[in-house]
C-alpha cells in the first residue's frame, strides 16, 4: 500500500494543522508547525483562494494522511459509513477511529499512528489474547487490546507511554498503562473525537 514518504512536517505546514505524524516533536512543542504556522516555500505565508472542489479534496487528503489510510481503504470505509444509519460524515470518523492501529495509538502505546501500525503488522499486539496483525481491523466494544508480553519493555513503547501520559486518554477507552493493555469500552461520539477534519467536505466530494 502506498504511503507518503516526504517530509511530514512540511506536509503539516501545507495543511496548516498538526496531523500527529511526528510524535515526540509534537508532544514536546518542537514541531515545525509550532515554529512556523504557515505553508512551506518562498510564498508560504500567502494563502491562495481555493475552489470548493479543492477544499473538498484537501480535506480528504488531510484525513488520509492523518490516519495513514490508502485511497482504496478510505473509499471502502466511506461506503460502509454511507450504508449505516445516521450521519455519513460522523459514521466515517467513528469507523476510522475503530481501526486497530488507531486504537493502539489512542491507548498511548505509540507516539504516532505509523508507529502503532508497525506494532500491529509486526505481531506485537493482541486482541482478546490472540495476535492480530491487521491494522485495518475494526475493534468492537468490550475488546481487550494488549501489547505482547515480550514487547512491553520495548524502549519505544515505554517512551511512548511516558510521553502520552501528558495528554490523557480518550473517554471511550480504559487503559492500564503500566500493564500495557486497554479496553475499548464503547464506540466514540463524533464530538469526542478531536481531529481537525471537516468530514462534511469529504462527504460532498464522494457524493459527486
From Swiss-Prot:
Organism name: Helicobacter pylori (strain HPAG1)
PANTHER family membership: 30S 40S RIBOSOMAL PROTEIN (PTHR11831), SMALL RIBOSOMAL SUBUNIT PROTEIN US4M (PTHR11831:SF4)
Lineage: Bacteria, Pseudomonadati, Campylobacterota, Epsilonproteobacteria, Campylobacterales
GO molecular function terms attached to this record: rRNA binding; structural constituent of ribosome
Pfam families: Ribosomal_S4, S4
Keywords, alphabetical: Ribonucleoprotein, Ribosomal protein, RNA-binding, rRNA-binding
InterPro entries from the UniProt entry: Ribosomal_uS4, Ribosomal_uS4_bac-type, Ribosomal_uS4_CS, Ribosomal_uS4_N, S4_RNA-bd, S4_RNA-bd_sf
NCBIfam families (UniProt xref): PRK05327.1, rpsD_bact
Protein name: Small ribosomal subunit protein uS4
Amino acid at each position: 500500500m502506498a504511503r507518503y514518504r516526504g517530509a511530514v512536517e512540511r506536509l503539516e505546514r501545507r495543511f496548516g494543522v498538526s496531523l500527529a505524524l511526528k510524535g515526540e516533536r509534537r508532544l514536546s512543542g518542537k514541531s515545525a508547525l509550532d515554529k512556523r504556522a504557515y505553508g512551506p516555500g518562498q510564498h508560504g505565508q500567502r494563502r491562495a483562494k481555493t475552489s470548493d472542489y479543492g477544499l473538498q479534496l484537501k480535506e480528504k487528503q488531510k484525513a488520509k494522511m492523518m490516519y495513514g489510510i490508502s485511497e482504496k481503504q478510505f473509499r471502502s470505509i466511506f461506503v460502509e459509513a454511507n450504508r449505516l444509519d445516521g450521519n455519513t460524515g460522523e459514521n466515517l470518523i467513528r469507523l476510522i477511529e475503530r481501526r486497530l492501529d488507531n486504537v493502539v495509538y489512542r491507548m498511548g502505546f505509540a507516539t504516532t499512528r505509523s508507529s502503532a501500525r508497525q506494532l500491529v503488522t509486526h505481531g506485537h499486539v493482541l486482541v482478546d489474547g490472540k495476535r492480530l496483525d491487521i491494522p485495518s481491523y475494526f475493534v468492537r466494544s468490550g475488546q481487550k487490546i494488549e501489547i505482547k508480553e515480550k514487547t512491553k519493555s520495548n524502549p519505544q513503547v515505554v517512551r511512548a507511554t511516558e510521553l502520552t501520559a501528558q495528554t490523557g486518554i480518550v473517554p471511550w477507552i480504559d487503559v492500564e498503562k503500566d500493564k500495557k493493555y486497554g479496553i475499548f469500552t464503547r464506540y466514540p461520539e463524533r464530538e469526542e473525537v478531536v481531529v481537525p477534519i471537516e468530514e462534511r467536505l469529504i462527504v460532498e466530494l464522494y457524493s459527486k
